[in-house]
């Protein structure tokens, strides 16, 4: 189906040369940190598929920009995972619902990596091998505060100081 990141992350030109020589689509993963990276790689012909990881591109806003660049250039996108907790998985599920995410993603059930997670309900895989996007507001998951408290080692409170002139520092 694809070769995912077959060369070094900073080797965009050789990815382009490889993609010209083979029929199998090259999928860039670690090479894509922004929509500009995606635009550049697509323009060079370095890939025919892009993997987006929220943590790598810096969050939803940039992930949406990468998805838009790919969609405008008919480049399929899929969501990669990085062993996230249920909170991170919830973000990945939300991202994977965007129109350009046309390939199966790398989001799995919480239980694959965590005996007990910090979010509820658990992310589960259906008998068909799919994940269902929650229908609740927001990300559709709640935090298991009892679990978080049991894992908490220390709590700190950060207070923003206000100067005599009323400016915060």
Residue ranges and their predicted role:
Residues 127-139, 145:
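C-terminal accessory segments
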Residues 139-169:
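Extended hydrophobic packing segments that form well-structured cores
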Residues 2, 8-27, 32-130:
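Shared catalytic-loop signature of beta/alpha-barrel
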Residues 65, 87, 136, 145-147:
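Residue-level recognition of conserved structural "scaffold" positions that shape functional pockets
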Residues 94, 100, 137, 146-148:
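Ubiquitous "structural anchor" signal
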